[in-house]
């Protein structure tokens, strides 16, 4: 089994291991290995995932996870444009239907909809490189009702170890797997290649 990404939650009574899955078979393997939370998503609203799943697959994964007594975490952490916000409620309704335990959120608009409509799943603040201080995390916990937060990968260990003294909600740290460039929808790499002509034939 190849593990794509794994995180741990601290400031809790015990360490919680969260892992992404790239197939239903890998979900089963991760559950057998003792992972506490399975992290998955679909193509429109989830970012930084090894693969995406259809609604039917998410339903199947939810059953597997809950039958094993574990928790399902679904990515809703995209930066939402207006057309995406217009489509978000049916997806959140679906997540409620399959009894999703947690969702990750990176956009304030999604927090607003979740709180307005009273969904039962818990929310985790996940804005990637933006999550760099304990007071910022506490703000999202107090004002938006986030139950946890995902810390930026760039935080130095010296700062990281001081955070629990101030944090009011648990935080997740990436312990294994690839990191990312934060979502912007700007074609940065292609612009770089075009500027440097890096793809041109060289003799």
What are these regions (language model features)?
Residues 13-131, 150-203:
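Active-site pocket-lining/capping segments in soluble small-molecule metabolic enzymes
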Residues 143-148:
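A cross-taxonomic marker for long C-terminal extensions/tails that follow the last structured domain
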Residues 1-4, 8-9:
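Short, positively charged and aromatic/hydrophobic N-terminal segments
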Residues 134-135:
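Conserved nucleotide-cofactor-binding alpha/beta core module
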């Amino acid at each position: 089994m190849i593990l794509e990404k794994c995180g741990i939650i601290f400031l809790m009574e015990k360490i919680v291991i969260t892992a992404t899955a790239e197939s239903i078979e890998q979900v089963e393997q991760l559950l057998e290995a003792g992972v506490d939370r399975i992290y998955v998503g679909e193509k429109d609203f989830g970012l930084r995932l090894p693969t995406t799943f259809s609604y039917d697959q998410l339903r199947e994964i939810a059953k597997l996870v809950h039958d094993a007594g574990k928790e399902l975490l679904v990515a809703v952490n995209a930066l939402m444009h207006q057309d995406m916000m217009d489509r978000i409620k049916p997806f959140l309704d679906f997540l409620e239907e399959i009894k999703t335990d947690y969702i990750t959120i990176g956009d304030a608009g999604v927090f607003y909809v979740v709180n307005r409509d009273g969904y039962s799943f818990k929310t985790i603040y996940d804005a990637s490189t933006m999550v760099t201080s304990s007071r910022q995390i506490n703000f999202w916990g107090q004002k938006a009702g986030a139950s946890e937060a995902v810390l930026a990968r760039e935080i130095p260990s010296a700062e990281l170890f001081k955070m629990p003294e101030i944090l009011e909600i648990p935080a997740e740290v990436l312990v294994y797997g690839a990191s990312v460039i934060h979502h912007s929808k700007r074609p940065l790499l292609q612009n770089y290649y075009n500027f440097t002509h890096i793809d041109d034939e060289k003799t």
